[in-house]
Amino acid sequence: EFQANASVSAGSWDNYRSMLDVSTPMTEDGRVRARIVGVTQDRHSYQDRYQQKKNAFFGLVEVDLTPDTVLSMGYDYQDIKPKGVTWGGVPLWFSDGSNTNWSRSKSMAPDWTRWDNRSENAFIGIEHGFENGWKLNATITNQRSKSNARLLSPLGYPDRNTGLGM
């Protein structure tokens, strides 16, 4: 039977998300059915300068070849683009040995840092159920991913007065 679910949410630190999930039979008898899910999110963070955009998609088609055998074909895609990405943490002490006491939102990441990640996955599989409860599965998968990062990891202990030394 046809089913659909949609949601929109907003939260702290400009966190906005929307999702749509639709499942439907493609034939009257329901032997062929499909599902599609899409998600988008745009959010900031308690961490200074950090923000992230995310898009994801999932599609699946299932076909009942026999009452005991199902063929599945699907594809999923995910694109995540964070900015203001940290690579490491913040120093806990100044060069004179005193505690920095920075706020928990303190980040050493400049706004030009990023760590983009995209992944795609396509698959086809078959499952057969036997009368004794056993199942036989076979799946072929093709995965691709790409990552592109521009990061900075300052090290050292900054001078309390000038901030230099990292």
Task: Explain the meaning of each model-derived region.
Residues 1-59, 65-69, 120:
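Outer-membrane beta-barrel translocator/receptor signature
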Residues 41-45, 58-64, 68-129, 133-135, ...:
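Acidic/polar loop-and-plug regions of large Gram-negative outer-membrane beta-barrel proteins
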